[in-house]
From Swiss-Prot:
Reactions that this protein is recorded to catalyse: aldehydo-D-ribose 5-phosphate = D-ribulose 5-phosphate
Role of this protein: Catalyzes the interconversion of ribulose-5-P and ribose-5-P.
Gene Ontology MF terms in the entry: ribose-5-phosphate isomerase activity
Species of origin: Listeria innocua serovar 6a (strain ATCC BAA-680 / CLIP 11262)
The protein's name: Ribose-5-P isomerase B
Swiss-Prot/TrEMBL keywords: Carbohydrate metabolism, Isomerase
GO terms of biological process kind: carbohydrate metabolic process; pentose-phosphate shunt
Family named by the database record: Belongs to the LacAB/RpiB family.
Pfam families per the UniProt record, alphabetical: LacAB_rpiB (PF02502)
Active site, renumbered: 65
EC numbers for this chain: 5.3.1.6
UniProt key word Isomerase: yes
Induction: Repressed by GolR.
Domain of life: Bacteria
Amino acid sequence: MKIAIGCDEMGYELKQTLITRLKEKNIEFTDFGSFENEKVLYPSIAEKVALEVKNNDYDRGILICGTGIGMAITANKIHGIRAAQIHDSYSAERARKSNDAHIMTMGALVIGPSLAVSLLDTWLDSDFSGGRSQAKVDLMEEIDQKNR
């Protein structure tokens, strides 16, 4: 698995924590910023990561800002991307199993580092289940195509 990860300055410390976890799990990743003491407008980072995932250069993406909301909204502007804001273990699991979310977003001002690592593990260890959820994901894609 290959992960694209990015954040704004508010998410920098949490991103570093998640990078440590990716290394522990021997998961290949690329850090798309922001970098230490770098101020960025988060939509630019969300766009970079979402495009990398959309173009199949990376299997999944992780985006972190203050709340996770703006990153999710921006990533979902990219045709074909499903980004989910994750702040609890059930949502982390269902984002993958039910919705086949390509990108998880988190809020560094909303959750702490130990919860973030747990959510990352849950999200990484969950796969799309298909079944009844397949029709829902297919309809999401149809709506996305129709409204581009």
